[in-house]
Amino acid sequence: MSTRREVILSWLCEKRQTWRLCYLLGEAGSGKTWLAQQLQKDKHRRVITLSLVVSWQGKAAWIVTDDNAAEQGCRDSAWTRDEMAGQLLHALHRTDSRCPLIIIENAHLNHRRILDDLQRAISLIPDGQFLLIGRPDRKVERDFKKQGIELVSIGRLTEHELKASILEGQNIDQPDLLLTARVLKRIALLCRGDRRKLALAGETIRLLQQAEQTSVFTAKQWRMIYRILGDNRPRKMQLAVVMSGTIIALTCGWLLLSSFTATLPVPAWLIPVTPVVKQDMTKDIAHVVMRDSEALSVLYGVWGYEVPADSAWCDQAVRAGLACKSGNASLQTLVDQNLPWIASLKVGDKKLPVVVVRVGEASVDVLVGQQTWTLTHKWFESVWTGDYLLLWKMSPEGESTITRDSSEEEILWLETMLNRALHISTEPSAEWRPLLVEKIKQFQKSHHLKTDGVVGFSTLVHLWQVAGESAYLYRDEANISPETTVKGK
C-alpha cells in the first residue's frame, strides 16, 4: 500500500502539466522536506529551491538553497527581490531547462512578499511549475486560493502509515499485539504527524522491550513512553493538586489569623525597621587591601557564580563554560570588548587589584570586596598599570572559535543564535553555507565589530550578551546598585 506522501510525490512528478501553482502544506515533521528532496533528485528537468530571508531591519533577499544542475548551477546565490525573476530566468537559460520546477520553502512566512515576487517570475517563465511549501495557516491559505494556487495537504497519517513509521528500522516483537488502535491514537496525538517523533517512539519501544524482556507493556510503562514523546498531563494534574492545597491552606490561615493577632506578640522580624542613613564614607582607597584571588572571586560574582577566594583561580572557569583572558590593552580597547575586567592599580607603593564594572564619560566604577568606588577617568588611568584579566563565555562545546570545520551541533547553535539576534524566521541549518557567513557579517556590522565573517572572541561575546547569558560592562551610572558606594578620586 502506498503512503500518502508517495501518492502526492507521484502526482507532483507527473510528466503532463496538470498543475502550475501548488501550495503543499503540512505540520512540522509531516514529510514536506522529504518530498522536496525527492523532487530535487529529478534528473529529467531543472529543479531550483529558493527561500525568502528577511532580516531584523526588514530587508529581504532570495537565497538559492538547492539546484540540481551539475554545472553552471546557482546554489547559494543571493538575489534581491527586484532581481529575483530576472536572475532566475538567466540561471535557467544557462542550461537547457525545459519545464523547470521552482520550489519555494517556508512559504507561510512573508507570503505576501512571496506572492508579489512570484507573479513576475511566472510571467517570465511560462513553462515552469512553482511549488510552495509551508505550514497550515488559514490566512495564508485564503490568500493563496484567491491567486488560484492549488492547495495540497499532507494531512494526518492513517493507522497503517502510523504503524509503518513506528516500525521502520526497528525490530519490535509482536507489533500487532502491542500497537493497538488505542495506543496508535495516543501516539498520533502526541507526535502530530512528526515522523521524527514516531521514529523516537519506535526506538523507545524496542529499547524498553529489550530492557524489560517482555513483548507487552503495562500501563505504567506506556505512561513512561508517552512522557518521552511529550505528554506532561500527569505533571499538570500534580501541579493542580498542589496549587489547590496551597490555596485552601492560605484561605484557612487568613480566616483564622484574626483570632490570634490579639493574643500573640508580633515577632521581631516582622516589625519594620527604620532605614538608617549611612554617613558619607571618605576613606582613602589606598588603605583598602584585596588579594588577586579575592578580586577573581568578585569577578566570578559579577558573572553570577559564588566562588570562595581560596578557590578562585582561572582553572575553575572551565567548569562554568568560561575562560580567562589576560594581557595589556588601552582603556578604549577594553571598553569595546564590553566585559568587566580586573585592573591592577599602583596606589602609592602597593598594588591593588580592582574589578572594573562600569566606564562612563568621566568616571569609572570599580568593585573592591563588597564596596563600589567611583573614580575619575584621569586618576584611574594615572594609577592603572594597563594590564587586565577578564572572563568570557566560549562556545557550547568549549571552543574559542566556530568555523566550517566545527561540529554540526556548534554550527546549528550558531545559526539559531544569529536568527534570534537578527529576527530571521527561517529554519536553522547544521551546514556551513554562504548564507550563514552573510548572517555572521550582518550581526558583526550591527554590533560595530570587524565585519570579516569569522566567529571568534568578540562575536561570541556579543552573541552570548544578546542572549542574556553573559556579563557585560555597564556604560551608565544608574545601573550600579552596590551595598556601599564610596566616592574616590
UniProtKB/Swiss-Prot annotation:
Induction comment from the UniProt entry of this chain: Silenced by the DNA-binding protein H-NS under standard growth conditions.
Pfam families: AAA_22, GspA_C39-like, PG_binding_1
Gene3D superfamilies (alphabetical): Cysteine proteinases (3.90.70.10), PGBD-like superfamily/PGBD (1.10.101.10)
Keywords: ATP-binding, Cell membrane, Membrane, Nucleotide-binding, Transmembrane, Transmembrane helix, Transport
Residues annotated as binding ATP: 26-33
Main subcellular location: membrane
Compartments reported by the entry: Cell membrane
Transmembrane segments: 237-257
GO molecular function: ATP binding; ATP hydrolysis activity
Note: Part of a cryptic operon that encodes proteins involved in type II secretion machinery in other organisms, but is not expressed in strain K12.
Family recorded in the similarity comment: Belongs to the ExeA family.
Physiological role: May play a regulatory role under conditions of derepressed gsp gene expression.
Name of protein: Putative general secretion pathway protein A
Source organism of the structure: Escherichia coli (strain K12)
